[in-house]
Amino acid sequence: FFMRPIEQPIPYLFVDASYYKVRDGVRYVTKAALVVSGVRADGYREILGAKVTDCENEAFWAGLFEELKERGLTGVQLVVSDGHEGIKRAVSTSFLGASWQMCQVHCTRAVLRNIPKKLQKEVAEWLRRAYGDEQRLQEVADKLNAMGYRKSANTVERFLPGLINYTAFPKKHWKRIRTTNMLERVNRELKRRTKVVGVFPNDESLIRLVGSILMDINEDWISGIRYLTMECEEE
């Protein structure tokens, strides 16, 4: 499944991870099952690849992206993920001319991590209204800084360039390309169906089960409803 050719251009690429306990020798460690999916040129979703790792640095991501390109991945214009520096750097070198979009949901979570609970709802609303507008996001950062929440202000400023890239694409796509929600639902299904295992004996057992679940999801996606209406479909 993860060796098959990628036959269509993938303008929108989504990356997300879920975490599992895996036995590593005599130890039990947490490892990431990273899933890469995309929206094809015909508007349908497709699961492109998955890998188990305990290291998410730039070299890992660059290697994974290279494997996908060797299988035929082309046409990438936007990569949507969390704020992991390794992904950001790998996108800039692996997909020349493509943009990186910070998932707005992940950004909000990161900002609220350092905000008192009584203010979280209000700050989340500020962010919701500001996303997609560079000036308004900077105003939110300045406001948080003035209130003494420097860490949260730094988070907004650090991700700011990557929070507005989705606005360069058709407006009708915005809702679905500004977050990794498409993969969040996949990860929930993975968690639900792997729960019975508890701890995996090795990486291979984890990727086997994850792979079989992703195959089922991929079949549903390809045979289901078109996820986005692409420009070529309207002509």
Regions found by a protein language model. Give the residues of each.
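RNase H-like nuclease fold core
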Residues: F1-V80, E85, R89, S94-G97, ...
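A generic hydrophobic-helix recognition signal that picks specific residues
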Residues: P9, G75, S99, W174-R178, ...
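Inter-helix linker motif
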Residues: L96-R113
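Conserved phosphate-handling catalytic cores of large alpha/beta enzymes
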Residues: V111-D133
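Acidic/histidine-rich catalytic cores and adjacent linkers
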Residues: R129-E235
